[in-house]
């Protein structure tokens, strides 16, 4: 009986850890900007990162922006040089000469990324 109770407690502890890991706070990104522009137009893009923490032990470690498979912007953060807040925004300008796929992704130093955000811009 004691063995089965101990085994049950162990299983609950493992499941609890797995559930917490699955819902751990990962850095998430959103992209705001126009979706259709004239060829040659320089457009602003707002990249917003959302994270639950911004302390010396738990913060967004990096943010990168890729346009048509080429990295066009990157910010790296450290314990001593963290983002200004748990949620923050970066603005970039990009000249659109052809249809573009812009991908932004950020990563938490402990839990990783929720995955990339994708924004498509079409040339009229």
Predicted regions and their residues:
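C-terminal segment of classical bacterial N-terminal signal peptides
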Residues: 14-21
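N-terminal edge beta-strand
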Residues: 23-44
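Extracellular Ig-like/FN3 beta-sandwich strand-entry sites
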Residues: 42, 97-101
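Short edge beta-strand/loop segments characteristic of extracellular beta-sandwich folds
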Residues: 44-52, 91
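Beta-strand signatures of extracellular beta-sandwich domains
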Residues: 61-66
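Solvent-exposed serine/threonine-rich low-complexity stretches and specific carbohydrate-binding patches
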Residues: 71-82, 120
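Aromatic sugar-binding surface patches on proteins
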Residues: 82-91
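Short acidic/polar inter-strand loop motif in beta-rich domains
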Residues: 106-117
